[in-house]
Structures are given as structure tokens and as C-alpha cells.
């Protein structure tokens, strides 16, 4: 019942998704500013993370006995009174019975009334805290650090703000059916025993909180992640397997980058060749057919294997061809490989 009321409070207050409802009345005093909680990541089917309280504060996991004197400011937030109906359907009724402990037999809904009154917000002065922890180190021998470090899904967080009640508050739940003229009435007006429940809890009870994640380095230094973009956790040691995987990933990335660069350069080079060829009014194809001019031949017929074209076969991507010219020679080789069109004509146009 308490968890349902705090969830409803957080949903209505909002705060951009930073507020977390306190799950249990018995643990409400463990979500005070500078207290430590463990955030456990779930699988992709459950995007919401689970927060677990701990009996420790930030000072407990730091080396040295110096206290943290960061100031905590407080102010009134709002006056909260809420009444709502919750429908019972399928297996949900069994879950609610276990949660609120009332008899819902024959009922189709329960009415929940939460009276928190004026609630206050207590938050740590972030700038002061960041200055104080600049030279502080984490104690890796602390049991909470050892246990959290061994789990890859656990992230240590520090409570930065809490929302508390200021007076004695009450929660009440009634089971019944929805009426047409009235919002709610009992199934058995003569004997409503077991169909209602109320609890009263003291002032200064925490009902919601927000946290900042901690990122802990191998040398014991740590950062408080003050933005949602920064992620907490532990810096991992570079094992042999991890190092090999990291190097392999970098090699593949670099190789792919080089391939894309070569494709880009090759495409630009070919564009220049084609534009240079087609922009000229005279085609060397006609000239090459005249008597005494250079002839395009198939090099395979002369037992010369195919290879990269001397014009467009440069770079990492070899554009191979079987055609060439025996009347031209390069670097002591008595032939040149040239694509039929347009490399053959462009080569001889430049030679001319």
C-alpha cells in the first residue's frame, strides 16, 4: 500500500524521471541525502532499474576519517492529497491482496486515499560536495565495494535529494464495486469487515529520492555523474582477452576506414578521368584505328596475365584488366595495361 502511494506521488510530481519512489515503509529512513544505494540494471525487457538500499553513506566507503560537510538545503515542495480508484482484473487482484492485505472477494476495484500533507525537499549542495571529494579515494577493502565490483550489473549511487513528509500521514484502502451515482460503495454495507485498511506513519518519512551514479577508477579516484549522459560503474582492468578483443576491433575499424577512403579516392579519380575524356571533342578511339598508331590488344592472347590498369588501378583497390598496348612501355616493361574505355584513349591522348 505504501509503495503504491509513493509510485502515484512520483508519477504526478514528475521531475523529469529523476525521482524514484521509496519501495517500502520499513526502509524509508535509508534514503537520506549522502546515503548509498545500489542500482541494478535489468534486461532489455525491463527498462526500469531496481534500487536497493544499503546501511552505508558516502563517507563510509572513503579512505580517512574526515567527515563530509557538504550542506543540505531544504524547502517546502507542495501539499499532497490524493484519492484514486484501482480496478481489479485477472491476476492483478492477487498481487494487490498480498500488497494491501484486505479482502477483495467480489470486488471490482479498490479506493486508495493518500494524505501526505505538506512535503519538503532536502538536497545536497552539489558544488560544495564536488570540492570536498576532489582528493578523496575509495576504500576497495570495504565490503560494499567488493560486492558491487564483482557484479557488472550493479552501480553504486549516492542519494542527492529526498522528499519527506512534515506531519503524521495516513493511507487508507477500501475494497468494493464502482457505483453509478457514487464513486465507490461497499459490497456488504452491513458487514464491511476486512474490506478496508488504514495505516498511519510518522512525520519526516521519506517518500521519494533521486541519485547520482558513481564512476570508480582503478586507482581509487571517483567521479559523481551529475548528468544523465555520464554513466557510473567501475573501471575494468585490461585482461589479455579484453586487450586482444580491443586490438582486433581497432584493426577492423581501421581497415574498414581505409577501404572507404580508397573507394572515395578511386571514385573521385575515375570521375576526373571520365570528365577529362568526354569533355574533349576528339576521341582517340578513331585515332587508334588508323595505320601506324597504337593498337589495343588482349594481353591474355600473349600469355600476359591480367593486372591493374596503369591509370585507374592505383591505390588499395586494384582495378584489373586484360587489355593493353605493346607500343608503349613503362619502367622497362614493354607493354602497359589499360582499360578499353576510356583509359586506353586517355593514356594516348596524354602521350600525344
Swiss-Prot record:
Question: What causes induction of this gene?
Answer: By noise exposure.
Subunit field text: Interacts with MAP1LC3B; interaction is direct. Interacts with IQGAP1. Interacts with ROCK2. Interacts with TRIOBP.
| Tissue specificity annotation | In ear, it is detected in the organ of Corti and the spiral ganglion within the cochlea in the sensory areas of the vestibule (cristae ampullares of the semicircular ducts, and maculae of the saccule and utricle) and in the first 3 relays (cochlear nuclei, superior olivary complex and inferior colliculus) of the afferent auditory pathway. Detected in hair cells of the cochlea and vestibule but not in neurons. In the afferent auditory pathway, it is present in the cell bodies of neurons but not in fiber bundles such as the trapezoid body in the brainstem.
Task: Report the principal subcellular site.
Answer: membrane
Superkingdom of the organism of origin: Eukaryota
The answer to whether UniProt assigns keyword Metal-binding to this entry is: no
Write the lineage as a comma-separated list. Answer: Eukaryota, Metazoa, Chordata, Craniata, Vertebrata
Q: What is this protein called?
A: Pejvakin
The biological process GO terms on file are:
detection of mechanical stimulus involved in sensory perception of sound; pexophagy; programmed cell death in response to reactive oxygen species; regulation of peroxisome organization; response to reactive oxygen species; sensory perception of sound; stereocilium maintenance
Provide the species name: Mus musculus
> What family is it from?
Belongs to the gasdermin family.
Q: Which UniProt keywords apply?
A: Cell projection, Hearing, Membrane, Peroxisome
Q: What does this protein do?
A: Peroxisome-associated protein required to protect auditory hair cells against noise-induced damage. Acts by regulating noise-induced peroxisome proliferation in auditory hair cells and neurons, and promoting autophagic degradation of damaged peroxisomes (pexophagy). Noise overexposure increases reactive oxygen species (ROS) levels, causing oxidative damage to auditory hair cells and resulting in hearing loss. PJVK acts as a ROS sensor that recruits the autophagy machinery to trigger pexophagy of peroxisomes damaged by oxidative stress.
